Amino acid sequence: MLQDKGLSESEEAFRAPGPALGEASAANAPEPALAAPGLSGAALGSPPGPGADVVAAAAAEQTIENIKVGLHEKELWKKFHEAGTEMIITKAGRRMFPSYKVKVTGMNPKTKYILLIDIVPADDHRYKFCDNKWMVAGKAEPAMPGRLYVHPDSPATGAHWMRQLVSFQKLKLTNNHLDPFGHIILNSMHKYQPRLHIVKADENNAFGSKNTAFCTHVFPETSFISVTSYQNHKITQLKIENNPFAKGFRGSDDSDLRVARLQSKEYPVISKSIMRQRLISPQLSATPDVGPLLGTHQALQHYQHENGAHSQLAEPQDLPLSTFPTQRDSSLFYHCLKRRDGTRHLDLPCKRSYLEAPSSVGEDHYFRSPPPYDQQMLSPSYCSEVTPREACMYSGSGPEIAGVSGVDDLPPPPLSCNMWTSVSPYTSYSVQTMETVPYQPFPTHFTATTMMPRLPTLSAQSSQPPGNAHFSVYNQLSQSQVRERGPSASFPRERGLPQGCERKPPSPHLNAANEFLYSQTFSLSRESSLQYHSGMGTVENWTDG
């Protein structure tokens, strides 16, 4: 009776070597007898009912050869097969798409089955993709030892397998010949054919014994060529359109395909650092004073751009590295002193362009109070007396200084406003506030020199530690106020404390005067015993008698 049944188009029945088909059927004959009482619920030893023969006949037909398997999503597999299915293989293992899913019927609900898959070479050729088609490139490489992928639910009863689709979506393909994870090992650019095996489990819930019965089902549309990257763009399109995990490659509509744009690299990956540079670069080009602002993080927090707009600066590490201009003309800007000693910087970014038209922004915008850590080094009695205007050494304030013309009325100075070349270099910062003395006769010991600014702290500066030289600008301001309190017969009292340095051409006798001041420092008489302490050291009152 069993030999008269024909196989379906999509399934083939195989039997392991052993007894003949009739003997295998005879060996399976006791199973219906055991299953019949369970199905009918009759007690053992009772005579069979009238329907027992019908149940036994139905159970006899549920043998391994009667199992039918249908491929899920067969139409999708056919689309891939017509284009030439490709499956990606990687060292870590890659899942198949479309996934191998089947619908199984015709099993014995009480019998346990094991479902497994193996993938075998479809031919003995190696392929290459050329001229938009697959061509034979040579002889196939030696096949790797075949591996079987057993479904995780195995072994299970026929009722379990027939209840729902049987999915092998966790199966992974690899090209790692030493793979320890049980993935199926394949060679790239070779054609393979998956096969589904249904094996009846033995008494030990295993298979492989001499009398094991099994059947194999092969679907030709599931054959594929293993690749490390997709070769045919049609396959790429089909995968993107149908794979639910490829939504990121689609447009707003699922049917809108963007493969051409992906191939032309119209979606570049832009890092955050590049975006910061692009956002900051327009601000850098519009504000020429960003260079001095990069000295310390404190300066970035206390100072703003000069264009009148309150711009929000980024963190120092977010700014591009090359923000200093390559060339800078010192005659175009007033700026505070900036000297470098190792890695320390003194940046007081209070500058204003000669060419800049008068703006509506107040002068408080350009004169900022010193940073908090600078103020901590000053004496408490003099911190309140140091004004931002004195700290920045900015001249050209206009009508506030009598006898000094505005910025726009004077030509640019040949050097900077502080005459750096007139003072010999020191190991650290030497920021000095110079008083401008009106033209008048000097005492006798100054008759050999021309009129020049006083340098009140040269003697004190020689004994100052280099680490505290950053704050000499505040010291000198305090010392100038001390001199105002002390008696002096040579200098009139009507001279007020200047707001900054006066721009004038450097005197030809400047160097000689400096040397004379150095030599006369300790020879001058000092009459006051009152000493004023600051963050830089001790300065005594001078008399010019």
Curated annotation (Swiss-Prot):
Q: List the stretches of this chain annotated as a DNA-binding region.
A: 71-251
Question: What PANTHER family does the record point to?
Answer: T-BOX PROTEIN-RELATED (PTHR11267), T-BOX TRANSCRIPTION FACTOR TBX4 (PTHR11267:SF29)
Protein name as catalogued: T-box transcription factor TBX4
Originating organism? Homo sapiens
* Matches recorded under PROSITE patterns: TBOX_1 (PS01283), TBOX_2 (PS01264), TBOX_3 (PS50252)
GO molecular function, a single term? DNA-binding transcription factor activity, RNA polymerase II-specific
Bias category Basic and acidic residues: which stretches?
Answer: 482-505
Tell me the Pfam families matching this sequence.
Answer: T-box (PF00907)
